[in-house]
Amino acid sequence: MKHIILFVLMIQLSHTSTLTLKQMLDSANNNSTLTQALEQERLLLEARNLADTSSDPMELFGSAANANPLVGEDEIEYSVGLSQQFSLGNTREEEQSINRLNNEAYFLEEDKKILNFENGLKSLYHNYCLDNKYYNVSKQNYQQFVKLYKKKQKAYKYQEVSKAELMQLEIEKNRLYAQLQEIEMNQVISKQKVFVLGRINNAHTTTLSCKDIYPIRENVKLDGDRFQLSQEAHTKRLKSTQVALERHSRSLDSISLSAQYDKEIDIDRVGIGISIPLNFTSNRSEQERAAAMYESSALGFQHEQTMLEKRSRLMEYRSYLNSKARMLKTLKNNHRNYKKQLLPLIKKSYDLGETSVIEYLLNRQKSYQLRQEIYATKKAYYNTLFKLYALSEMKDK
């Protein structure tokens, strides 16, 4: 029977795989519906741009009438012709360029969603790693306490400890167990979030490495150009207004040509016509240029305000990370001293009967509270760290 169980365990282990953070991100990106949706929308807007700026179809026109001359037989007179509008210069190309630049700016803004998704997934990965570690430590702590409880149970049989003391230990054991169950549930939920958003199959046979979590740093460095996507989008929108100014600066941007054949009773006539819009009789082009200039100014002011707010939030995040990193150092030192020095003394004093069970339990709870505070501070640090990377619109280093 033991050999069968061992064989089954070996088969399960052989099918177990471990994913790193990079592999998880690759899995998410390769199966991302967000990326696919943006690609389809990109094709849609480009097709619509070409459709909206394509030349108008050639027009066929004609008419017919029954002629009743005073002399001769009745005949049918008719007229048929073709007309076509032609854009002059680069009018059509400029209109396409205006739309294309605005579309490109829009998709640069949409790329932030992908960056936000990636950073959100990184944050979930780190949360799971913290939850998993916290669960393992809490489980070990619970198991150690169970050993102590069993030891005291034996001591109670020999009347070395009181019934009240044993009951207090039992209450603490039950509390730790309930606490452990809650921590385990949080860890399971945390893992499910990562696997669902990361598009990872075989959750039961796949584990996460957690050896590649980011170090806690007081000063987070952001190399390269910050807010690059926003800057590029703003540049493209400004460029579109410049193209619009050029587009509406011409006094003549299109003409219409026509050819017509007239068949009358005793006359065949072929005519060619041209239609030229008299733009000087309308202020449309002038208003279009004014609109482009106003749009350029508005974009500049909006971008300046947006960058000001982003820089302010960036400073806020970096200050927050710095304070959390410093706090973690203090908490770890306190917990280390408490665990290595004070708690062993309390435990020894309790074993010798010099300290009450309540005092011993209170000191254990204090150690747990310090560990819990470290765990919560780390979570807050990583959540803010990836908000910082998302805000800066760049890859972290």
Question: Predicted segments — roles?
Answer:
Residues 3-12:
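Sec-dependent N-terminal signal peptides
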Residues 15-58, 160-169, 198-242, 307, ...:
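Bacterial Sec-pathway N-terminal export signals of envelope proteins
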Residues 22, 31, 202, 373-397:
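Acidic, low-complexity, intrinsically disordered peripheral segments
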Residues 26-87, 223-287, 390:
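A small-residue-enriched
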Residues 35-38, 45, 99, 106, ...:
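Amphipathic alpha-helical coiled-coil segments
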Residues 36-40, 53, 86-114, 164, ...:
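Sec/SRP-type N-terminal targeting helices
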Residues 114-226, 314-324, 328, 367, ...:
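Periplasmic alpha-helical coiled-coil/stalk elements that build and connect Gram-negative outer-membrane
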Residues 149-166, 342-360:
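Alpha-helical hairpins and coiled-coil heptad-repeat segments
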